[in-house]
Amino acid sequence: MTNTILDTYSSRRKPRRIGILTSGGDAPGMNGAIRAVVRTAIQNGCEAWAIHEGYEGLIQGGAMMHPLYWEDVRGFLSRGGTLIGSVRCDRFREREGRLQAARNMVLFGIDALVVCGGDGSLTGADLFRSEWPELLNELVSTGVLTVAQVAPHQNLNIVGLLGSIDNDFSGTDATIGCYSALTRICEAVDAVFDTASSHRRGFVVEVMGRHCGWLALMAAIATGADWLFIPERPPRDGWEDDMCSIITKNRNRGKRRTIVILAEGAQDSNLDRISSSAVKDVLSKRLGLDTRVTVLGHIQRGGSPCAYDRWLSTLQGIHAVKAVLSMTPESPSPVVIIQENRIRTSSLAETVALTKEANASMHAKEFEKAATLRDPEFMEYHSAYRHLNTSDHPKMVLPEDKRMRVAIIHVGAPAAGMNPATRAVVAYCLTRGHTPIAIHNGFPGLCRHHDDTPGSVREMHWLESGDWINDGGSDIGTNAGLPLDDIETTAQCFERYKFDALFVIGGFEAFTAVSQLRKARKQYLAFRIPLVLLPASMSNNVPGTEYSLGSDTSLNTLVYFCDVVRQSASSSGHSVFVVEAQGAEYQATAAALAAGAMTVYTPERGITLQSLSNDIEYLRQQFSKDHGANRSGKLIIRNDQTSTIYSTTEIANIIKHEAKNRFDAQGVVPGHFQQGGKVSPIDRIRAFRLAVKCMEHLETFAGQSPEEIMNDENSATVISIKQSRILLLPMGGPTGVEATDTDWKRQRPKTQNWLEIQEAVDSLSGRSSLYAIPN
């Protein structure tokens, strides 16, 4: 392509051109970011340009840089890696390379860049912007470009997206790709469980993460690993003895497998590397364990992104374009982050500087400082893991007068996360000297079968729940029955078995149960004990919290189902699938965003004949312009409570009838499949942390009188995730959750923090207010 032809790109006044590139190591979710940037740019009257192979494409120019249109990014959401390529470009580190990149930016008329990558990629981006005026001056002074060519491009806007499986950036809760990588690790370790147990083997599993131990720490928690090595927390001298002691105790309890998780950057306090082979040798020689080493390697980067990475990359991509359009010449380059569970922007330079400071702190042996600069929850997770992994330690056991008989009960529909949470409660209780007691099959089980043999009220032991780390459903049984169904017998059982605290896990029914017990304290002395609710519901509808256990597992299951259905729809050509989703509005809306659905029908929105007619007309427009294009199948998600008239089947039939043979439509119902199988890593690690927090709260009431407990509003609480904060909120009182955030009629919170997602679903499908594809 000649300079004369290229000149036309900058000489004609066109809409703003926003370039998107991915650089450094690939991460699942990058394609979701590309899709969001492209379609949001088009929605805002801009052009989106792909720059292939990262900064190398920016330097080479030519065919490496081209526009992306609306349909070009169809199907991107479910694809792993990056479809526009990524390389580690040494040439961009040199000024000559950046000079060539600036030349191509001007010639192609691109005046804004969205860069998705790691710290090296974003450091290069910030340097590129700071040098931009000098680079243009040099290109003009050397005759490479003319004053007229560079005049429209005096300012360069750059926005960063954090794409890294390592989650090694400071100041953000998560990076694009980190939870998908964690999912790959957990899938691999879950598979190792079977062979390890069969042969009573030990496995040392080495995971990626460079100098950051986030992946290793979360994998250790999510798989119940016996021991953990991370660079931020090097083991003390003599770690071999400590590790062997813990593993020996676990083996003596009857555990058949041993799992050790080791970060690839693991080191001791002298910064000497701890290798997986060295750990294997310790286990083999000292304990005589048949031990294997499994280095997961690049398998962690691959595969389809999990639901979290899909919606994170999508919302951050949307935010990146908005940031570009709102920037002034004086604005510092921003980076889009997620902080306190909200999408925000921060200073790119400061974020990179803090990340480098964390790495420098480790090299300086300032491990405490390095750990505090990681993910905000890093320290708490590590502390909780360490405490629960050192059961029988004399320093952890409480005095006799502080020990409690803690009853554990599951209430409501089964939800993934119930078992891992129960496992964590049991482990914590045994570590601290408490007695964990399982109430089987909910309140009806307590009332009807506590006298049976075996009874429904049974003490739990360490080995009994040891393998529940990834089990879905409820192994102690759950039931929707409530205390008021038989309040007299419930009180008698509480008194008979001398419960000192009640740990309730479940959804809105569990919330109702705790409310009933709290209100019945005036009549029944047995209920004057601390009560705590850990929300677990695929519907994510427990008042007071933004997150319930099981909702992530269910969402991933539904998204996988939608991916398979979409594949069928696309293979068949012009097909529409209407998928019915359980789990209140949250599941349908979040799945629509993560699966790239055309639209979502929820009770909040409702559905009318007019809105359905508009959507059918939109489908006609879409299919008429496809002309046999690939991946042309469409997806509509409908919550099962949306309408009693317009059922999933009815909607599909109406669409099919109105299509008049131009396209097909079918309704599909995943049903209870949506509850999921194995628990997702996010549900596992949150179950662990929330269970520990709940137990720490219950311990504060040890030794108090029944009257003191009854008069303390914090003695009946629900644990809540609000933004990224974990709070224990009182159920009762004028400012309690029951009064301020409970919609009893609809069985959900009054505050719905995820409703803004619906706008993103419509925007990225092209189904905006006029139901027309943007030109």
From Swiss-Prot:
Residues 391-404 are annotated as: Interdomain linker. It comes from the Eukaryota. GO terms for molecular function: 6-phosphofructokinase activity; AMP binding; ATP binding; fructose-6-phosphate binding; identical protein binding; metal ion binding; monosaccharide binding. Its EC number is 2.7.1.11. Beta-D-fructose 2,6-bisphosphate binds at S537, M538, S539, N540, N541, Q582, G583, A584, D640, H672, F673, Q674, Q675. It is an enzyme of class 2 (transferase). It holds the Pfam family PFK. PROSITE patterns: PHOSPHOFRUCTOKINASE (PS00433). Substrate binds at S164, I165, D166, R201, M208, G209, R210, E264, R292, H298, I299, Q300, R301. Allosterically activated by ADP, AMP, or fructose 2,6-bisphosphate, and allosterically inhibited by ATP or citrate. SUPFAM superfamilies: Phosphofructokinase. The keyword 4Fe-4S does not apply. Pathway: Carbohydrate degradation; glycolysis; D-glyceraldehyde 3-phosphate and glycerone phosphate from D-glucose: step 3/4. Residues 405-775 are annotated as: C-terminal regulatory PFK domain 2. The active site is at D166 (proton acceptor). It catalyses: beta-D-fructose 6-phosphate + ATP = beta-D-fructose 1,6-bisphosphate + ADP + H(+). GO terms for cellular component: 6-phosphofructokinase complex; mitochondrion. Disulfide bonds: none annotated. PANTHER family: ATP-DEPENDENT 6-PHOSPHOFRUCTOKINASE, PHOSPHOFRUCTOKINASE. Catalyzes the phosphorylation of D-fructose 6-phosphate to fructose 1,6-bisphosphate by ATP, the first committing step of glycolysis. Homotetramer. This is ATP-dependent 6-phosphofructokinase 2. It comes from Aspergillus oryzae (strain ATCC 42149 / RIB 40).
